[in-house]
Amino acid sequence: LRQENREQFKDQVILIKGARKFRFEYIAGFLQKQSHATVLEVDFDAMVHNLNYFRSLLPRKTMIAVMVKAFSYGSGAGEVASLLQYQGVNYLMVAFADEGVELRAAGITIPIGVMNPEPEAFDHMIEFNLEPEIYSLELLEAFDRVLTKHGIEKYPVHLKLNTGMNRSGLDPEDLPALLKFFETKRKVIIRSMFSHLAGSDEARHDEYTLFQINRFIEMTKEVQARFDYPIIRHILNSAGIERFGQYAFDMVRLGIGLHGISAVGAPLWPVSSFKTYIAAVRQVKGDQTVGYGRKGVLGRDTRIAVIPVGYADGLDRHLSCGVGEVWIGGQRVPIVGNICMDACMVDITDTDAQVGDEVEIFGKHILVTELSDKLGTIPYEILTSVSLRVKRIYFKD
């Protein structure tokens, strides 16, 4: 391979297939352009397992929309979307039009909804057949005017109803004006009506969740009664599917559950593994310090490993000084001193670790939920914080 001109493979898709024991990732590494050895491994088998788990909770007729916004929660937009399209999901949902345009460029042909449409992007959305969420009458009127300009009719939109999240959406008192708008022939059709649950993952909010669901039922009945075509209804997110599956309606929206996070402790599989390697090892005397601000106080002679991952890669700086750990050689070792922009140091005194050994930041041994709990945040933030300079590697047996 080293005798080959790698430029001949530019912009080509190459299938490298075989058992993991053959370490074909070395061939992939030779061919790829991005060579930073800190990587995010994405296990497509785990993702399909998780998708099928949520499918098993739903009636067969229930459609599934999958959230692929924010680079598919950090896992890679086009790659994950292609897998989901192959797996037969009904809709993909992105946050902004640019994300949808990127998916179309990657060959995605199934319907794509845009959750945060901006009027400036309406023309792009129409060009690439992206379906906007409509959360206000003003936005609906603006989009209808753009459709009139293009001479387009029956363009699908998704009506967002505010049932208690109080972030965006049409309130019950907005419905008369909405229905009056449709008394005149319009260029849009309502493809779906949906709402967002504020606390479906926590039992302490169950009464409020049921209040939201009942309000959603009332609002959608009022709207549907004025139209002679069926409008899709959806309110359940990942936690809602697990805890309130009887309200699946016509479609559900799967997000964090696809990535292995369950609201009920279900045996989902971790999808992403954030990994690097030991770049250097040094012996440091116990009376010395390590890192910026001399915050790495040792107290004993210590073997320090330097690993090429820092806060610019997505390793949260609040994990500095022993708060966080990494997995090396079958055990946990603590982070020493302050995490740097591009590197951090860990204590490997009690291991046989050497230069070149693999390091797991999170994955099968240190779960994303463990990190989010330790940092007082949510798994979404951990996953979406992994920098784009970190290479994504996809596995499927």
What kind of feature is each model-predicted range?
Residues 1-49, 97:
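ATP-dependent carboxylate-amine ligase
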Residues 6-10, 126-127, 246-247:
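Flexible, charged surface loops at secondary-structure boundaries
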Residues 7-10, 51-62, 152:
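Glycine-rich phosphate/diphosphate-binding loops that line cofactor/substrate pockets in enzymes
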Residues 8, 30-33, 81-83, 130, ...:
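Short, solvent-exposed amphipathic alpha-helical segments in soluble enzyme
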Residues 13, 91, 251:
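Short, Asp-centered acidic motifs that coordinate Mg2+ and/or phosphate
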Residues 13-15, 19-23, 162-165, 238, ...:
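Short glycine-rich anion-binding loops that position phosphate/pyrophosphate groups of nucleotides
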Residues 39-49, 62-232, 248:
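Active-site-proximal beta-alpha core segment in soluble small-molecule metabolic enzymes
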Residues 41-43, 48-56, 63-66, 99, ...:
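Active-site anion/phosphate-binding pocket segments in diverse small-molecule metabolic enzymes
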